[in-house]
Amino acid sequence: MEEQARPPSRPAASATLPGSAHPGGAASTATAAALSFSSVATVTLGNQSDAGRPEAAGSRGPAPLLWHGAAVAAQALVLLLIFLLSSLGNCAVMGVIVKHRQLRTVTNAFILSLSLSDLLTALLCLPAAFLDLFAPPGDSGPWRSFCAASRFFSSCFGIVSTFSVALISLDRYCAIVRPPRDKLGRRRALQLLAGAWLAALGFSLPWELLRAPREPPTPQSFHRCLYRTSPDPAQLGAAYSVGLVVACYLLPFLLMCFCRYHICKTVRLSDVRVRPMTTYARVLRFFSEVRTATTVLIMIVFVICCWGPYCFLVLLAATRQGQTTQAPSLLNVAAVWLTWANGAINPVIYAIRNPNISMFLGRNREEGYRTRNMDVFLPSQGLGFQARSRNRLRNGCANRLGACSRMPSSNPASGSGGEVVMWARKNPVVLFFREDPPDPVMAVYKQHKSETRDSSI
């Protein structure tokens, strides 16, 4: 009888690897440990080529399956938190700006664009990440178009978000550093916003449009399609990736830093130049500009921290020219998630730094809101209610400041000017002025102006 050919046996884990300098012994043990760690990392990332096969699932014990389930649950929890903060927070910001007419200003138009881009990112990009956690591994198949659309939306809205923060910094630069005549008007602001959205659309579309005339793409998993940090270098070239990062991220980052530097310089000089002040309205403006500059700095820091790793990985992939041959690593996934998290951080900054948003979210800061919007709020009320509001505000200032309330007033027309000044120093407000506030505060009660002041976030 002819003997049946036996299948080639699998080498043992301790066998000597080809090209190994020291066969057996400690080298074999280190190799086995490295292979074991690599398999655990593959299970943790999920959606790899052999993760869903029955024989692979049978070969794994209950411990790797438990670790895999815990990793998927943790990732789903993080994505859910980002989704809730981005969607609910940005909806709240947009609702406040649209609801209150006095907030429909130039600066808030840029913030509205930023919130809209973050909201669309949460609604159109995060569902693909949830699908990736539970989709079977292998070829993306019917989800290929959905993955391509998700990557397009993520790129487009990410560029819009970066441009919007740069425009906010530019608006603050023009309002604080430049003379009042150089401030951005409504028409110029709309032109800048339209240019930002069109530029984002133009930079994002070639990722998929330039791919059609080329050779058919190789099959890839949904996970690999979603977390690819740059276009295919073989089709679009490394120059496109570098140009995209420089034009859409690095240049806006430099503009933010430039504006922030000059804002800090101007505020520091103003702190020396404007003392003593003749009216406490100017003191309110000074401290509000200081807090405004701090808020802009916080936004810039988070934008750079969230988008910096992504830009670095795009440049790294462009230099290595090997993005298509490698599966997305943990760094790619973390970098993309950081860009999504930036949209969830911005509403938190607004809620902490702005009394309007915090009041909308249920925090009781009515006095600060009325103080910094006195020229908008009081003319719409009766004279008796105005007097009661002023008296209640004075009493609140005196109770909060104690000894500081005895500070002599810089405004001789009002005995409580020093109190309000000190209260403003303790509780500064976020106020962006488009026009100078009236010097005497009593002019608010005598004039009923039709146009409202700028009190943006």
From Swiss-Prot:
GO cellular component, as recorded: endosome; endosome membrane; plasma membrane
Stretches of the chain found on the membrane's Cytoplasmic side: 86-109, 178-189, 257-295, 351-457
Name of the protein this chain belongs to: G-protein coupled receptor 135
This protein's record includes keyword Glycosyltransferase: no
Entry's transmembrane regions: 65-85, 110-130, 157-177, 190-210, 236-256, 296-316, 330-350
A GO biological process held by the record: G protein-coupled receptor signaling pathway
UniProt subunit comment: Interacts with MTNR1B. Interacts with ARRB1 and ARRB2 in a spontaneous and agonist-independent manner; leading to the internalization of GPR135 in the endosomal compartment.
Spans annotated as Disordered: 1-27
UniProt membrane topology term: Multi-pass membrane protein
Reported function: Orphan receptor. Has spontaneous activity for beta-arrestin recruitment. Shows a reciprocal regulatory interaction with the melatonin receptor MTNR1B most likely through receptor heteromerization.
Topological domains, Extracellular: 1-64, 131-156, 211-235, 317-329
Positions annotated with a glycan in the UniProt record: 47
Disulfide bonds: none
